[in-house]
UniProtKB/Swiss-Prot annotation:
PANTHER family assigned to the protein according to its UniProt record, in alphabetical order: S-ADENOSYL-L-METHIONINE-DEPENDENT METHYLTRANSFERASES SUPERFAMILY PROTEIN
Presence of keyword Cytoplasm: yes
Family to which this protein belongs: Belongs to the methyltransferase superfamily. RNA methyltransferase RsmG family.
Binding site for S-adenosyl-L-methionine: G75, F80, A127, E128, R146
Task performed by this protein: Specifically methylates the N7 position of a guanine in 16S rRNA.
Protein's name in the database: Ribosomal RNA small subunit methyltransferase G
The encoding gene: rsmG
Segments forming a coiled coil: none
The enzyme's E.C. designation: 2.1.1.-
Length: 237
């Protein structure tokens, strides 16, 4: 598909420089995918819709403002949504977290090649450690995670990272009433609450997507996130 095809469904359009960066990111993804198994979504609609568009559609309120932000992407994997956000929000400072060293090295190399070194920091560690680090805890206006774990687990990763006015965005595929109930119970224990669910039908019949925003209702209790591995083994309920 054309690299310009998805933009007409957003309230934001990339500049020519940003479009060049998205194209360059695709080239880098091809290169690094041959060395490290980053993602199968590299070509055509897989890249432009399932990677770029799907990374950015939940951020339309922030895309239209273009304000300085501190953003964290937990479980960035092959660099999404983090690198796409870094290109789309040139005033933002991003922290990308993943526990797989080879992926972190690849994403760092791609960020450097894109000229994003000054704005993108990589951390190779488990999300639970990030949430307990005073340099990260309560520091971010926006925290995102895509395809990382069950929603209550992701909430425990993200909410401790949020500043008082911050928002966590949980990227999901399908979403049920029971999913919502489970997340609301977890969110309450984290002193946070869910906001209006965002729904998007991806272009080219690529499926239905949901994003669930979480906002702090006060300070997250100090015991969260729990020790490494505990949130996934014993999700908040």
């Amino acid at each position: 598909m054309s690299s310009t095809a998805p933009w007409d469904q957003l309230t934001w359009q990339p500049s020519s420089d940003q479009l060049q960066q998205f194209n360059r990111l695709q080239e880098l993804l091809r290169e690094w995918n041959g060395k490290v198994n980053l993602t199968r979504l590299v070509e055509g609609e897989d890249y432009w819709i399932s990677q770029i568009f799907d990374s950015l559609w939940p951020l339309q309120p922030w895309l239209s403002k273009g304000e300085p932000l501190k953003v964290i992407d937990v479980g960035t994997g092959g660099g999404f949504p983090g690198l796409a956000i870094a290109i789309a929000l040139p005033q933002a400072q991003l922290t990308l977290v993943d526990s797989v060293g080879r992926k972190v090295q690849a994403v760092q190399a791609m960020a450097d090649a894109l000229g994003l070194t000054e704005r993108v920091q990589l951390r190779c560690e488990r999300a639970e450690k990030t949430g307990r680090d005073p340099h990260c805890r309560r520091q971010f206006q926006l925290a995102v995670a895509r395809a990382v774990a069950a929603a209550p687990v992701v909430a425990e990763y993200l909410v401790p990272l949020l500043s008082a006015d911050g928002t966590a965005l949980l990227y999901r595929g399908q979403w049920s009433d029971e999913d919502q109930r489970q997340l609301q119970r977890a969110a309450a224990q984290l002193n946070s609450s869910t906001e209006t669910i965002q729904v998007q039908e991806l272009p080219a019949e690529r499926g239905l997507r949901h994003v669930i925003p979480l906002r702090p209702q006060g300070v997250c209790p100090k015991q969260y996130p729990r020790a490494v591995g505990v949130p996934a083994k014993l999700p908040l309920a």
